[in-house]
């Protein structure tokens, strides 16, 4: 039970605070009445699949895997930002123009997002078509995708 309580507290701390190091995490846990060793912290970080993600100031903090700034998600966003040139939509389709040879990566990034309104992607060399359902959500999906370009 102690491990479950400790790991739940770690998740809470990582969600609510900027924790940059294992030492900071250990200190935060100790302040909550949960003393731990560095080895325990290290095991918990691995089991909880915490990752380090960059902050705007260049420092890194621990994050949960599903957080928007987490490692895999950040890689997909970076691919999207660097490759996408334009986004437009018509009917239930969003058309994305990208740099030559990057459409497959862009489509994979979109698929990774897992938005329920996007039912599939088709990628060529420099164009991705996103099929949206329901059709009246297409404009919103296009705007959300444009937001990933920033």
Curated annotation (Swiss-Prot):
Q: In which pathway does it act?
A: Amino-acid biosynthesis; L-arginine biosynthesis [regulation]
Q: Name one GO biological process term.
A: L-arginine biosynthetic process
Q: Which InterPro entries is this protein grouped with?
A: Arg_repress, Arg_repress_C, Arg_repress_C_sf, Arg_repress_DNA-bd, WH-like_DNA-bd_sf, WH_DNA-bd_sf
Q: Name one GO cellular component term.
A: cytoplasm
User: What is the predominant subcellular site recorded for this chain?
Assistant: cytoplasm
Which residue spans adopt a coiled-coil conformation according to this UniProt entry? none
Extract one GO molecular function annotation from the record: DNA binding
According to its UniProt record, what is one Pfam family this protein matches?
Answer: Arg_repressor_C
* Compartments where found: Cytoplasm
* Keywords attached to this entry: Amino-acid biosynthesis, Arginine biosynthesis, Cytoplasm, DNA-binding, Repressor, Transcription, Transcription regulation
Read off the HAMAP family from this record: Arg_repressor
Function in brief: Regulates arginine biosynthesis genes.
- What family classification does the UniProt entry report for this protein? Belongs to the ArgR family.
Protein name according to UniProt: Arginine repressor
Starting at the broadest rank, the lineage of the source organism is: Bacteria, Bacillati, Bacillota, Clostridia, Eubacteriales
Gene for this chain? argR
